[in-house]
Amino acid sequence: MVEIHLKNSKSRKVELLQPIEPGRVSLYLCGPTVYDRAHLGNARSAVVFDQLFRLLRHVYGAENVTFVRNFTDVDDKINARALAEGREIADLTAETSQWYLDDTRALGVLDPNHMPRATEYIAEMVAFIEDLIAKGFAYARDGHALFRVRSFDDYGKLSGRSVDDMIAGARVEVAPYKEDPMDFVLWKPSSDDIPGWDSPWGRGRPGWHIECSAMAHALLGEQFDIHGGGADLMFPHHENEVAQSCAAGHGFANIWMHNEMLQVEGKKMSKSLGNFFTVRDLLDQGVPGEVIRFVMLSTHYGKPMDWTEKKRAEAEATLRKWYAALRQSVAEQEATPHLVDSLADDLNTALAITTLHGMYETGNFGPLAGGLRLLGLWSGTVPDWSEIAEVDLTYFAGRFSSARAEAMVTKDFTDVDALKSALTAAGVEVRMSKDGVELVPGPTFDPAKLEDL
């Protein structure tokens, strides 16, 4: 059997995956808080751990892998959005949960074995908290239940922090119901206008951290193999998960994996910079899901990823070539051992893609198909978008070249810009270089829009 090695955030070392139950693997991923569309950062986490899921299924067999990815459907952000839109919370979370599934499926993300919703596990959360209080790791005060951070000696080891440093260097909520500023909320009271459930501490709702611990315990048991999530969740979310779960006597996760963050054109993605994209934004712009996935897999999960227009164009061009090769009635073969070994080496998707390039260049299209399937980029049929429209753009290329040459002399690029805008609006990619102009029909190409030209 192939040996899989993964970077464990807890030990900061690449370790051999040794399943707790030989031959069977369990995986938990922190899923979305459902109140809006999934942005590209959310999508990276979904794609990365889907790729791990696919590798585990390939090595151990689909029936021997259990993957849990939750929906957080009780949260103050959800409450605020529902209030702002005048909607029922259940309607909002149902709609946005489906959005998430639709968008991630478009990226080739398989549905996990279990997709629990936090609201379905309130009883388990209450029981979990009661156990922590009984063991002295938590306490109740003023309708709240809180975890005593200093009672757990290993607090901070996952993220590499000490409690004293955290207090000195971070803004910590100071509240009268806390014994210590570092204590975190397990349960909090709810007013009449927001969701709440009966509990020994009064009507209220769970804190974010207890949700994942309770759902992981309910579906995977006291100890499981791998816990994943974005690097931004390591502290405080994952640190708090470790504390409350281990304090309860659960071994919790053996290996912790974290994917790094995503930026756009070299800058942090933010609405203020105007570079904030949701998955749906790109799909609606005609960017195929396979292209989005390819770009994400081109960077190792442990490194920051930069989404750029250049990478998108290169990914699309590469996939068009590969799909054209597979259109030739290729007999699909298993992914090669070399490609599987690349993925088994801390999920090195970038190396796996390099291996696929080599297969294409040497005409090994059968293994290419198998490799693309393992990477979630091939389902057995060539996607329609990859077929380049049969159209002669010679006239427009000549016209653009002439206008460009004249503009280089007159320094007036008005006609060039107008023609380029019209071509782009028609779904034509304009590629300019010192060798001339190349016009390439894109996935949204509409020849009707060229008629006025």
Swiss-Prot record:
Question: Which protein family is named in the record?
Answer: Belongs to the class-I aminoacyl-tRNA synthetase family.
Q: How is the cofactor bound?
A: Binds 1 zinc ion per subunit.
Q: Report the protein name in the record.
A: Cysteine--tRNA ligase
Q: Where is this motif: 'KMSKS' region?
A: 268-272
Q: How does it assemble?
A: Monomer.
Name the cofactor(s): Zn(2+)
Q: Which gene encodes it?
A: cysS
* GO CC term (a single one): cytosol
* SUPFAM superfamilies membership: Anticodon-binding domain of a subclass of class I aminoacyl-tRNA synthetases, Nucleotidylyl transferase
Give the top-rank taxon of the lineage listed in the UniProt record for this protein: Bacteria
Report the record's Gene Ontology biological process terms: cysteinyl-tRNA aminoacylation
Q: What is its main location?
A: cytoplasm
Sites binding Zn(2+) sit at 30, 212, 237, 241
